[in-house]
Amino acid sequence: MSTNELEERRRRALAPAYELFYQEPVHLVRGEGVWLFDNEGRRYLDCYNNVPSVGHCHPRVVEAIATQARLLNTHTRYLHENVVKLGERLGAKFPEKLSVCWFVCTGTEANDLATQIARAVTGHYGMVVSEGSYHGNSDLVLKLSTSSYPAKDRPDWLAAATAPDSYRGPYRAGSEPGGEEALAERYADSVAEGVAGLADRGYQPAAMLVDSSWDDNGLFVPPQGYLARAASIVRAAGGLFIADEVQAGYCRLGDTWWGHERYDVVPDIVVLGKPMGGGHPVAAVVSTPEIAAAFGKQIDYFNTFGGNPVSAAAALAVLDVIDEEGLLKNAHEVGRHLERGLAELANEHPIIGDVRGSGLFWGIDLVSDRESRQPLDRAEAKRIVSAICREGVLMGLMGSHGNVLKMRPPLPFSRDNADHALEVVDGCLCALAR
């Protein structure tokens, strides 16, 4: 069947909210490692998808799912070793106090549950998030996703702190006497203002929820000390700190397993999602025994599919592959190689205003004017990402202006893969400049 025919069938059968990437939609039929293949046999280098974190259709993950599916799939009201083992293995990846898990199916569910836990345990209702954030699409979590709707429609229990954007934000790198520490303090002041605003409206904070990569904002690297200050402010007001690791977790940033580890702060609650199952839908909330016990006294939480043995088998296989194949080290080493290559691209192409990220997560901020840092028009950015796709490399866009090229490949991404991707981006930007 042709791509056009399938697209027409899709248009009739699926709701219009389902968007397709790229000007010419890609009809994918197979994946292997860092490669995706379309219906005509053409292969694409995947520089976008972090759900298949250990590579598309990794044999260990596929076999784990198939083996367990042949035996049994049920829920957490029965004993099963896979589920217990997954909780133990995850707990071992965190500081000792973060040792208790709830299992769900998606990052949205995990953020929803984390918010419920914070509200139940603290007895407070207010929430603090970053301006321009995205955390999921349930009714509750969508309200926490300030990128998704106008500020005038926000509930009065929500405070949106200024996102720590050191490139285009109100406080920029090199602009503050006192350097990075002063910059961190400035952005943390916005959190304090948010907490004060909640108090004026009759709320105390239950928690501050932060995406440790600020992905939807455009991949920000906050000034050192910001996150610890922000968490301290919220805790002093009686709230908890929730780290949303759906994007940043599972070795994505190259130096650590979790994004928050880069900023010297231990969360009260951690949310896991996308990469956890290597392509299988599984997510989790991790917290302390004390918080778990306090929540359990109030709410008997159960999730029909969360923590099923098949999902647990997939998630255990992902942990095995990351450790045995040295994918944290690979993300670090290839990330350093990418960093150098992206810096060279930025030197050659005035359209690149900034390059941000680490490990295997990079944002290439496209601008129409470097001096003013004016974001490139969203439509033009879409044309560029579609041109890159036509050359066989899949990337995405992010940021509030839709102008930041998102580079977020599976963890087995190699130096050769990186060089190929950089060559394609370079060629497309050269063609644009002609």
PLM segments and residue spans:
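Conserved N-terminal phosphate-binding loop of PLP-dependent enzymes in the Aspartate aminotransferase
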Residues: 1-434
